[in-house]
Regions:
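Active-site microenvironments of metalloenzymes and redox enzymes
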Residues: 54, 61-178, 184-210, 272
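Short, well-ordered junction/capping motifs at the entry into regular secondary structure
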Residues: 121, 163-168, 212-215, 221-260
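N-terminal secretory signal peptides that target proteins for export/translocation
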Residues: 1-11, 345-346
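A short, hydrophobic C-terminal helix/tail in secreted or cell-surface proteins
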Residues: 321-339
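Disulfide-stabilized, aromatic/cysteine-rich ligand-recognition loop
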Residues: 33, 249-252, 272-319
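N-terminal signal peptide c-region/cleavage motif recognized by signal peptidases
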Residues: 28-30
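GGW-centered surface loops in extracellular recognition modules
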Residues: 33-51, 164-166, 170-175
Length: 346
């Protein structure tokens, strides 16, 4: 036992002095850390739909709402405090296009060069490629702040075009696979053989198009069979526009919002490397409800960017917020140090 305690003491000292210290350094929590509303998609091992999509072996989490302009501003100001736009994470159309939601001011102080445009902070970010979304996943994986955008969930190597890499084993944040996205949107839930809805509003009937007020809040609120499509949301002088997340009708069975209409959302297809990535859900100007339905999907170049593409991320079940896992590691460090001292005295 004495020999075991001495060995454990040595191990604890190594963990404390090297491993945990390094981990705590890499997971330093920024002052304005982004927090995310996650929902759990349970019923693991569910059957696929007749479309062949939707079967997922394990429970997972997915964002309740699409990634917004305000959250993307936090990302930009963290990873590009000086405004040099590494790896083209900022598309200038975000500022120049009326439907874009983010401005850039070169003369602003470092860390505040990007800002959400008036009434656009709570709208889904657009003009983002798959590469941009993957860099957000890496940013979260690395504890936010000024951490690397090139490693973590995905190994990107400063690429902005070409084949998209596979998601890395052990990723904590990632683009959902197509099956995960499909299940979160259309599965009825409650068992492994519950079946599927045609639309992500828990309905087999085409949604009614929402309208919008002068600040872009959807007319439907968070209930009912509605969606933002067929240019129904006319505001800010536009014939169809993005609207405030969560105000465009009812949720899916797993309590996700805006997975029918609003913005085409990137997905990772199978998660393997490839020359294309998927998108589902339709968008604010989809001329037919078919684009919003479970029968519609598209495969596109990962570098595509326009006012119709956005994203939401997924994660394994019970991934803590950055502050939580940083505190947990701090506890591990203190616990390891305490154990080492007790062992040393033994």
């Amino acid at each position: 036992m004495k020999r075991f305690m001495v060995s454990f003491a040595r191990l604890s000292r190594v963990v404390f002095s090297v491993g945990v210290a390094a981990l705590l350094g890499s997971l330093a929590v920024p002052a304005h850390a982004v927090t995310i509303d996650w929902v759990t998609v349970g019923d693991p091992g569910n059957a696929a739909d007749t479309t062949t999509y939707g079967a997922v072996a394990d429970a997972f989490q997915i964002m309740k709402y699409e990634w917004t302009n305000s959250r993307y501003v936090d990302f930009l100001n963290a990873v590009d405090a000086s405004g040099t736009n590494p790896n083209s994470v900022y598309n200038t159309n975000m500022g120049s296009d009326v439907r874009g939601g983010i401005s850039f001011t070169s003369g602003a102080s470092p860390g505040s060069k990007y800002a959400a445009k008036t009434d656009m902070g709570d709208k889904p970010v657009n003009f983002v490629s798959w590469w941009d979304a993957a860099r957000v996943a890496n940013w979260l994986q690395n504890g936010q702040g000024s951490g690397s955008t090139e490693t973590g969930a995905y190994t990107l190597n400063n690429n902005t075009s070409g084949n998209a890499p596979a998601v890395n084993v052990g990723a904590l944040f990632y683009l959902p696979t197509e099956n995960q996205w499909y299940k979160a949107a259309y599965y009825k839930g409650g068992s492994t053989s519950a079946g599927y809805w045609d639309y992500a509003t828990q309905s087999d009937t085409a949604p009614t198009a929402v309208t919008a007020g002068t600040t872009g809040i959807g007319s439907a609120g968070s209930a009912g069979n509605f969606a933002n499509y067929i240019d129904g949301a006319d505001w800010n002088g536009q014939n169809g526009n993005v609207t405030t997340v969560g105000t465009n009708g009812g949720s899916s069975a797993y309590d996700t919002f805006d997975m029918s209409g609003s913005i085409w959302e990137w997905n990772d297809l199978t998660g393997a490397a490839g020359s294309t990535r998927g998108a589902r859900g339709g968008y604010w100007s989809s001329f037919s409800a078919f684009s919003l339905s479970s029968s519609s999907n598209i495969a596109i170049d990962p570098s595509d960017e326009s006012d119709v593409y956005g994203f939401r991320l997924a994660s394994p079940v019970a991934v803590p917020e950055p502050a939580t896992y940083a505190m947990a590691l701090a506890g591990l460090a203190c616990g390891g140090f305490s154990m080492w001292r007790r062992c040393k005295r033994a």
